[in-house]
């Protein structure tokens, strides 16, 4: 296993990636030399430059001249010149999850995994620990206002991190608390079968290494329920389900805030108010509260922290709220996430919910096409674009028209539009939008830029054609 203390100069290939920049920031704050490269510049890379990182635009062999260890993610191909140079020089090469696993050894690790909600849940846990003055180290998969980024080096005993199950790397972490928000049939390109996915989560939950640690799980998930008999560690359950140890009940909206009551068995602990809508965020908040209670933080402190939690970037993030129109962006790219986000939007009582969706990966589109066809029930008007490949090669018969055709078959009365290129989408959305509408741009690719460009168009700033980032 990697020992951070054995290395002095880390080079990150793909430094601008959300998981990579979070780790780089931690190492810089720890006083470790960091360099890195990416294909294009960004605000994230500029921030790391300002903190002292040597940043290279473009991947070249000479970029790693001053490094004694290379860090890569699953997105880096074997033909990357920096990776090839590191191999030729016999430099140690580690996956980013190895760096995170090494950070977990600094203290009591709290790892959050699950098909959906792990970014928001881990961010909520971090905010609660901040308000409680626990000074945690935090590594997130999304950007938050309270961190002004997605990571921070703390001096307390807790390390809070999002654990990525997509490639199995979350099994490297030795934890104090392992949290699972849900288990679904995602990432089948890696696991092959749902059974293999569940086996991985069993191993993750059983990898709690502290005697006083435990497994905190959302029992609303059928996948979680299926593996409970195999969990050998202390289990604390939460959810809407009546059988949960900690329950969220009496969910309602007041002045666009989401309120719910929290019960521990039959004892009412109090009421929570969230700025972000939706039952999925209620579950995430409840999970964060349970983690905080387990670590000795009062319920009242959690309530205070969650009342000012503004969300995670690209998770129901407001882009514009003017001219009677509300433009929101959301990272949802799995059918369950899509359905939950649209349901939350519908419950907010706008005239129409318009959804512009960009499918993410050919493999996911193929494997979950039937689930996608059902996910858009709460959208009043739909726009679809071509598939965002995310580095995948095309699959014959799978393209951007697949999902809209299936949705049209299931919901023949819904207005459905196909706009192949994202850069053509803002003008089409501008024609469709009306006062009191909510528009949600949705997907894990570059669809968010369509909402930003539409906001500029509505504010009279015109359109930009920069859809590369």
Predicted region positions:
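P-loop/Walker A phosphate-binding loop and immediately adjacent motor/lid segment at beta-alpha junctions
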Residues: 82-92, 196, 207-213, 340-349, ...
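Nucleotide phosphate-binding/pyrophosphate-handling subdomain across enzymes
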Residues: 2-11, 19, 23-30, 255-256, ...
């Amino acid at each position: 296993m990697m020992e951070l203390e054995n290395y002095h100069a880390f080079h990150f290939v793909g430094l601008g990636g959300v998981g990579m920049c979070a780790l780089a920031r931690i190492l810089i704050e720890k006083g470790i030399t960091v360099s890195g490269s990416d294909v294009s510049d960004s605000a994230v890379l500029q921030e790391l430059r300002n903190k002292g990182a040597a940043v290279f635009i473009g991947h070249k062999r000479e970029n790693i001249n001053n490094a004694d260890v290379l860090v890569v993610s699953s997105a880096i191909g074997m033909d990357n010149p920096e990776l090839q140079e590191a191999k030729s020089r016999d430099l140690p090469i580690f996956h980013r999850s190895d760096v995170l696993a090494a950070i977990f050894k600094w203290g009591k690790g709290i790892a959050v995994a699950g098909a959906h909600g792990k970014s928001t849940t881990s961010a909520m846990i971090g905010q609660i620990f901040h308000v409680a003055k626990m000074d945690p180290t935090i590594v997130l998969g999304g950007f938050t206002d309270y961190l002004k980024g997605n990571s921070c080096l703390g001096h307390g005993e807790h390390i809070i991190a999002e654990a990525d199950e997509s490639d199995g790397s979350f099994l490297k972490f030795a934890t104090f608390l392992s949290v699972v928000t849900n288990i679904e049939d995602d990432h089948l390109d890696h696991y092959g079968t749902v059974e293999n996915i569940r086996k991985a989560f069993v191993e993750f939950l059983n990898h709690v290494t502290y005697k006083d640690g435990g497994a905190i799980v959302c029992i609303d998930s059928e996948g979680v329920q299926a593996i409970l008999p195999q969990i050998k560690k202390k289990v604390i359950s939460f959810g809407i389900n009546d059988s949960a140890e900690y329950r969220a009940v009496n969910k309602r909206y007041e002045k666009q805030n989401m309120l719910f009551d929290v019960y521990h068995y039959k004892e009412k602990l109090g009421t929570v108010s969230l700025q972000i809508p939706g039952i999925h965020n209620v579950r995430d908040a409840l999970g964060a509260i349970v983690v905080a209670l387990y670590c000795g933080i009062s319920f009242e402190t959690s309530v205070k922290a969650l009342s000012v939690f503004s969300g995670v970037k690209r998770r129901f993030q407001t882009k514009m709220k003017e001219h009677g129109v509300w433009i929101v962006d959301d990272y949802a790219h799995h059918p369950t996430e899509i359905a939950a986000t649209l349901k939350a939007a519908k419950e907010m009582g706008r005239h129409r919910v318009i959804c512009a969706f960009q499918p993410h990966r050919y493999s996911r589109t193929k494997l979950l096409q039937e689930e996608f066809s059902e996910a858009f029930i709460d959208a009043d008007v739909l726009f679809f674009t071509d598939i965002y490949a995310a580095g995948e090669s095309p699959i014959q018969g799978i393209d951007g028209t697949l999902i809209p055709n299936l949705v049209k078959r299931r919901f023949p009365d819904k207005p459905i539009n196909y706009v192949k290129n994202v850069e053509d989408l803002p003008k089409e959305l501008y024609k469709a939008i009306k006062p009191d509408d909510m528009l949600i741009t949705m997907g894990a690719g570059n669809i968010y830029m369509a909402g930003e460009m539409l906001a500029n168009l509505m504010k009279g700033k015109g359109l930009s054609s920069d859809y590369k980032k």
